[in-house]
A protein has these predicted regions:
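Accessory N-terminal region flanking or inserted into the helicase ATPase core
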Residues: 3-97, 106-111, 134
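Conserved helicase motor core of SF1/SF2 NTP-dependent helicases
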Residues: 95, 102-178
Length: 178
């Protein structure tokens, strides 16, 4: 079998596969985040074929799905998929605030699109300079091109002015930076 690293102080036994660093599980998670079939992601050849082989990947993906079904376990992505499937049950909302929007995956953007139709006001906050989850399927370009009124904060309240000024030096050298 595949040894899975896990860490969850509340329920290790049922969540061990969610926080692993195994390349098979990472690829399965990325396919879910990208909202594509695992075979499609495999065929993109973005992985090391010496490490990940189609046979075991297909088996692990189907076994994981069955394991979660039998044990009535849902991970975060399963919750998102359930909301998408049952969108007619989502009530009308006054406002929604989504932070770190630069790190949303296509699956999460699909839910955002549904929530837009269910709310009066939607606020997205994020910083494309801080997009760090492309490896997991995050779609920073969707964040950048999302229509709406854009407010760019010129000053950070998280770091000192001196640190901010120094960080602007390398950022300003990047072509196409906003």
């Amino acid at each position: 079998g595949i040894r899975v690293n896990y860490s969850d102080k509340y329920n290790e036994e049922q969540t061990h596969y969610l926080t692993c660093n195994n390349p098979y599980f990472q690829m399965i998670g990325k396919a879910i985040n990208l909202d594509i079939d695992i075979k499609e992601l495999f065929n993109r050849n973005e992985h090391d074929r010496k490490i990940i082989d189609w046979g075991p990947l297909k088996n692990i993906a189907s076994t994981l799905k069955e394991y979660k079904k039998i044990n009535e376990i849902m991970d975060f992505n399963d919750l998102i998929k359930t909301l998408i499937e049952r969108q007619d049950k989502i009530p009308k909302l006054k406002a929604i605030f989504i932070d770190e929007a630069q790190d949303l995956s296509p699956l999460q953007w699909k839910l955002v699109d549904i929530l837009k139709t269910k709310t009066e006001h939607m606020y997205l906050a994020g910083d494309d300079d801080q997009a760090i989850y492309a490896w997991a399927g995050a779609d920073v370009n969707r964040f950048i091109t999302e229509p709406g009124r854009e407010i760019i904060l010129k000053h950070s309240r998280r770091i000192s002015k001196a640190v901010q000024k120094q960080s602007e030096i390398p950022i300003s050298r990047i072509a196409g930076i906003r």
